[in-house]
Amino acid sequence: HSGIFDGAAIDATHVKAHRSAAGAKGAFAQAIGRSRGGRTTKVHGLVDDHGRPRVLLLSAGNINDISIAAALIQAAGPFRKLLADKGYDADHLRRLLAERGAEAVIPSTTSRRAPIPYDTLAYKDRNRVERMWCRLKDFRRVATRYDKLARNYLSSVLLAATCAYWLK
């Protein structure tokens, strides 16, 4: 194995924060933000071509997905294709992927004047990341955030990912 995985998929999910999760000092320590669903944390993830999580990061629930995308991509290591939804359609992200030698399989937003073509057959595999979120949210500790500190909640998510995907 060369260490380069073929495809990677990226996405984020909202997790509702229980009322007991509030109270840690500082917004960064909490990673809890107000969104339409109330107080939430957002878990950002990048999965490999087998649907196994490679990188998981937290942010406040009101942060948009693309603001964490560069950090996920940098932490992931080399890959050939990145599959993402329309929320990740930005020129700066496409440039970052081109610099890394990766193909962007991202549909264009409707506001883009000249839509950029993408591999629609490869895009069908993007559901790997959605299936990963469903599997991780089977763990009660991941589905609802009860921890005050972001680092404690992230540890719970990483432990659930390890149990679900890496221990066999």
List the model feature ranges, each with a label.
Residues 1-168:
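Short alpha-helical elements
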